[in-house]
C-alpha cells in the first residue's frame, strides 16, 4: 500500500472503509460450522512499513461479535496487541494455540477456543520483527530500538486503516522474548505518541527480561523442581558452569547482551538430567514444561503438541488466500534468518526500562510454574532487583492473594503500586496453551475486573456469548453425599492393637529425638560437596557473612548419629545442598542486554524462546 494511498485515506473516510473491506477474512476451513452469533469478525493481511527495504508486517485482527455482554459491563473499548517471542517466532502461535478465538482440529478446520481473550477485548496479532511468520523484508532488524521503531510505524499505519481503534485502551501482551519487545515498544509509543494512543498496561508471560539475573536461576530452580539430581555425576560440571556465568557477570569488561557462559548453564542442566535408561523420545526433560519429555538434544523443540497441525493449516493455499497474503510464503513457527540477524549489541536490557514505565502504567508479570527456560523463580529474582517505585526495590509492602477461577485455586497474585506478579499453577512456558480459560483471567486481573475476598481474588467465568459470573467455591454436594455412602463401616480394634500402636509411637518419638539431637548443631551448605578438598566455592546462593561460612565448616566426614539419620543418608539427603528460597543474595554486577538464548541454525531447526 503506497504512502499516497494512505494519505488519501486519511482525508476520505469512505476510502478507509473500503480499504478495510480488502482485509476481511471471509472464510476459513470449518468457519461455517461456528454459529454466526459467536463467530469472530476478522481482518488480516500485510501493512507496508518500509517501502525502500520491501518491509511489510503481517497482522491478524479479531473482534468479538457486537452486543457482547462482557464488552458492555466488565470491559469496554479495549484492544490487546499480542506478540510472541523468539526472536523470530510467529505470533500465529498466540492466535491459533493460545489467546485467539480459534483452534485447529485434526481435520485442519477451525473451531472455537473456549478460553478466547476476545471475550474480554479485541485482539491483534502481529508477526514481527520483519521476516517473522508471514511478514517479509529485504533488510532484517538487528537491534531492539530498530524493532521498536518499525512497530511504531506499523501502529501508525494500522490506525490509519482502522481509525476506530484509536479510541480504545491499548494493552501490549506477550510471552518469552516479548519480555524484551514489549517494554521497548511501550517506550517508543510514549515518546512518539502523536496519535494520543491510550496505552494502559503491559502483560508479560514467562518473560526474558534480564538474561544475567535469570540465568542464575537455572540451577536452584532445577534442583527444587526435582528433575536435576544433586547426586548426579554431572553435577560438578553444572556447578562449575554456574560459577563461570557468575564470573562473566561480575566482569566489568564483559558487555555481552547475553553471556555465552550463562547460556551454557542451561545446556549443562539438560545434559545432566538426561535419562538414557528411558526410550529415546523420553530421555530429555522438556525445557518449556518439565512435566513432559522429548528426544535429546531436542528437549522440547517438538513441543507444543498442536504445532504440527497449526503448521499444516497455515500452509494451506486456501488459508493463505483467506488471510489476504500478497504472495504465498511457507510459514515456520520460528524464522532462522530473523534470529541470526537479531543480535542486539547497542541496546540496554528491557529490565532497565521498567522503572520509568511503572511510573506511567500497570505492568503484570505472569509465569507458568512448570516452565524451565523462563521459570517463575527467575521472574521473582528479577522483581527482587527491580525498582518498583523511586527508591524501592522489590516487593516491600505487597499483599499476596490466592487466585480463584471457577471455584479452584489456580495461582497466586502479588501486587504493589503498578506492578503485579502472577504465578500460574500447573502451566508451562505458554500459559494460555495449557489453561486457555484460566489465562483469560490475567487480563481481568490487570484491568481489576475481579472480586476480592479476605485472602483471595476471584476472576469471572465467561460463556461463549460473553456472559459472566464469579464462582468462589465449587459446590459438590451430591458427589460428597455419594462418597459418604460408599465409605466402609468403621472397624473397632481390640485392646492389643491399641497397646501395640502406643509402643510404635514411643519408638518413633525416640527416633525423632535422636534425629533432632544429631542435627541440632549441623550447618547449612550452599553447595554440594564436590570433593574432600577444603575449597570454598566462589559462586554461592547464600552470602558468606549471613551463614558464617569458613573453609572448614561442613566439609568434615559426617557420621550418622542415629538410625533415622542413617536412613536420610542412604536416601541422599544427609549433609547435602539446602535449597535457597529466593535469589536476593546472588551477587550481581551491572550488566548489558540480551538476545535470544538459543541459536536457530536454519528454518528447519526452530529452537529458542517463544
Swiss-Prot record:
UniProt-listed GO biological process terms: apoptotic process; proteolysis
- Cite the active-site annotation: 176, 371, 429
Q: Which residues cross the membrane?
A: 495-515
Signal sequence annotation: 1-18
PROSITE patterns named in the record: CARBOXYPEPT_SER_HIS (PS00560), CARBOXYPEPT_SER_SER (PS00131)
Q: Does the keyword Glycoprotein apply?
A: yes
Note one Pfam family from the annotation: Peptidase_S10
According to the UniProt entry, the coiled-coil residues are none
Give the GO molecular function terms: serine-type carboxypeptidase activity
- Where are glycans found on this sequence? 68, 192, 196, 418, 426
Q: Name one GO cellular component term.
A: membrane
Lumenal face of the membrane: 19-494
Q: How does it sit in the membrane?
A: Single-pass type I membrane protein
Q: Which Gene3D superfamilies match?
A: alpha/beta hydrolase
Q: Which residues lie on this side of the membrane: Cytoplasmic?
A: 516-610
Give the UniProt subcellular location, in the record's own words: Golgi apparatus, trans-Golgi network membrane
EC nos: 3.4.16.6
Q: Which keywords does this Swiss-Prot/TrEMBL entry list?
A: Apoptosis, Carboxypeptidase, Glycoprotein, Golgi apparatus, Hydrolase, Membrane, Protease, Signal, Transmembrane, Transmembrane helix
Which reaction is recorded as catalysed by this protein? Answer: Preferential release of a C-terminal arginine or lysine residue
Stretches for region Disordered = 469-491
PANTHER family xrefs:
PHEROMONE-PROCESSING CARBOXYPEPTIDASE KEX1 (PTHR11802:SF190), SERINE PROTEASE FAMILY S10 SERINE CARBOXYPEPTIDASE (PTHR11802)
Function (record text): Protease with a carboxypeptidase B-like function involved in the C-terminal processing of the lysine and arginine residues from protein precursors. Promotes cell fusion and is involved in the programmed cell death.
* Stated family: Belongs to the peptidase S10 family.
* Protein name, per record: Pheromone-processing carboxypeptidase KEX1
**Which organism is this protein's natural source?**
Ogataea parapolymorpha (strain ATCC 26012 / BCRC 20466 / JCM 22074 / NRRL Y-7560 / DL-1) (Yeast)
Q: Which gene encodes it?
A: KEX1
Amino acid at each position: 500500500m503506497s504512502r499516497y494511498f494512505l494519505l488519501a485515506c486519511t482525508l476520505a473516510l469512505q476510502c478507509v472503509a473500503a480499504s478495510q473491506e480488502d482485509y476481511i477474512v471471509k472464510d476459513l476451513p470449518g468457519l461455517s460450522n461456528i454459529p454466526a452469533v459467536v463467530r469472530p469478525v476478522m481482518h488480516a493481511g500485510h501493512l507496508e512499513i518500509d517501502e525502500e527495504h520491501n518491509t511489510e508486517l503481517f497482522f491478524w485482527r479479531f473482534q468479538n461479535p457486537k452486543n457482547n455482554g462482557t464488552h458492555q459491563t466488565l470491559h469496554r473499548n479495549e484492544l490487546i496487541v499480542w506478540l510472541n517471542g523468539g526472536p523470530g517466532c510467529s505470533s500465529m502461535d498466540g492466535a491459533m494455540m493460545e489467546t485467539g478465538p480459534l483452534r485447529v482440529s485434526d481435520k485442519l478446520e477451525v473451531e472455537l477456543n473456549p478460553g478466547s481473550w476476545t471475550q474480554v477485548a479485541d485482539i491483534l496479532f502481529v508477526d514481527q520483527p520483519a521476516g517473522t511468520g508471514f511478514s517479509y523484508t529485504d533488510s532484517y532488524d538487528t537491534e531492539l530500538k530498530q524493532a521498536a521503531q518499525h512497530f511504531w510505524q506499523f501502529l501508525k499505519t494500522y490506525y490509519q486503516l482502522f481509525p476506530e481503534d484509536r479510541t480504545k485502551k491499548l494493552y501490549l501482551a506477550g510471552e518469552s522474548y516479548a519480555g524484551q519487545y514489549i517494554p521497548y515498544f511501550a517506550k517508543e509509543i510514549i515518546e512518539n505518541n502523536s496519535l494520543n494512543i491510550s496505552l494502559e498496561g503491559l502483560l508479560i508471560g514467562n518473560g526474558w527480561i534480564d538474561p544475567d539475573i535469570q540465568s542464575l536461576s537455572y540451577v536452584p530452580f532445577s534442583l527444587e523442581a526435582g528433575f536435576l539430581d544433586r547426586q548426579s555425576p554431572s553435577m560438578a560440571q553444572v556447578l562449575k558452569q554456574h560459577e563461570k556465568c557468575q564470573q562473566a557477570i561480575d566482569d566489568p569488561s564483559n558487555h555481552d547482551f547475553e553471556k555465552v557462559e550463562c547460556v551454557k548453564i542451561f545446556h549443562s542442566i539438560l545434559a545432566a538430567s538426561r535419562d538414557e535408561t528411558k526410550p529415546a523420545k523420553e530421555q530429555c526433560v522438556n525445557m518449556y514444561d518439565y512435566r513432559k519429555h522429548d528426544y535429546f538434544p531436542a528437549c522440547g523443540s517438538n513441543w507444543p503438541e498442536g504445532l504440527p497441525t497449526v503448521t499444516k493449516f497455515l500452509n494451506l493455499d486456501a488459508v493463505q488466500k483467506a488471510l489476504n497474503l500478497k504472495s504465498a510464503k511457507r510459514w515456520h513457527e520460528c524464522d532462522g534468518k530473523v534470529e541470526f540477524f537479531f543480535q542486539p549489541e547497542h541496546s540496554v536490557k528491557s529490565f532497565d526500562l521498567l522503572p520509568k514505565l511503572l511510573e506511567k502504567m500497570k505492568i503484570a508479570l505472569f509465569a507458568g510454574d512448570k516452565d524451565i527456560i523462563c521459570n517463575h523463580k527467575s521472574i521473582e529474582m528479577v522483581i527482587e532487583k527491580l525498582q518498583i517505585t523511586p527508591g524501592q526495590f522489590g516487593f516491600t509492602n505487597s499483599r499476596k492473594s490466592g487466585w480463584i477461577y471457577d471455584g479452584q485455586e489456580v495461582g497466586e497474585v502479588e501486587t504493589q503500586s503498578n506492578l503485579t506478579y502472577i504465578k500460574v499453577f500447573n502451566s508451562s512456558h505458554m500459559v494460555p496453551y495449557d489453561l486457555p480459560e484460566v489465562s483469560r483471567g490475567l487480563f481481568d486481573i490487570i484491568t481489576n475486573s475481579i472480586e476480592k475476598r479476605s485472602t483471595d481474588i476471584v476472576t469471572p467465568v465467561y460463556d461463549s456469548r460473553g456472559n459472566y459470573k464469579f464462582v468462589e467455591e465449587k459446590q459438590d454436594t451430591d458427589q460428597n453425599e455419594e462418597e459418604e455412602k460408599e465409605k466402609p463401616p468403621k472397624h473397632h480394634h481390640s485392646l492389643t492393637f491399641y497397646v501395640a500402636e502406643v509402643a510404635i509411637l514411643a519408638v518413633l518419638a525416640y527416633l525423632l529425638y535422636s534425629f533432632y539431637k544429631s542435627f541440632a548443631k549441623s550447618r547449612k551448605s550452599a553447595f554440594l560437596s564436590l570433593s574432600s578438598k577444603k575449597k570454598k566455592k566462589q559462586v554461592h546462593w547464600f552470602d558468606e557473612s549471613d551463614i558464617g561460612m569458613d573453609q572448614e565448616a561442613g566439609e568434615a566426614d559426617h557420621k550418622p548419629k542415629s538410625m533415622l539419620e542413617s536412613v536420610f543418608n542412604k536416601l541422599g539427603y544427609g549433609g547435602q545442598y539446602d535449597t535457597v528460597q529466593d535469589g536476593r543474595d546472588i551477587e550481581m554486577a551491572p550488566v548489558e542486554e540480551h538476545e535470544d538464548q538459543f541459536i536457530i541454525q536454519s528454518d528447519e531447526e526452530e529452537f529458542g524462546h517463544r
